């Protein structure tokens, strides 16, 4: 789904919050909830900076800038919140290189899936 379609859904469904979710190296689901007023096309396409040193096993404080990059194809309305909230799963990017962070479990899974597709191993 494109960023424009996500923004249209946010408007049409009167969404109040956007919950950006990702998994830490230990497999625990983490999230960052944002008021919908700060969500725009740039944020959906480029991501949001966050402090990676707050996640165990990721970055030291002096190199902690990371990016949560929403995957607009992985979105759903959270049925358990009292306010209209949309959830977007995110990839983690290195803020300096703008490339996938090598310790992001989601990124590791994507690399493994790609490797399996290119190898003789078929699942």
Task: Show which residues each predicted segment covers.
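ATP/Mg2+-dependent ligation/transfer catalytic cores
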Residues: 1-121
């Amino acid at each position: 789904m494109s960023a424009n379609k996500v923004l249209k859904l946010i408007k049409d469904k009167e969404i109040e919050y956007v919950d950006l979710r990702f998994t830490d190296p230990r497999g625990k689901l983490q999230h960052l909830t944002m008021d919908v007023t700060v969500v725009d096309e740039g944020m959906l396409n480029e991501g949001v900076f966050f402090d990676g040193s707050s996640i165990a096993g990721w970055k030291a404080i002096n190199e902690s800038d990371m990016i949560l990059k929403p995957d607009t194809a992985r979105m759903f309305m959270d049925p358990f919140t009292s306010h209209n909230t949309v959830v977007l799963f995110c990839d983690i990017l290195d803020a300096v290189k703008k490339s996938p962070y090598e310790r992001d479990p989601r990124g590791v899974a994507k690399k493994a899936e790609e490797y399996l597709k290119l190898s003789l191993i078929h699942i």
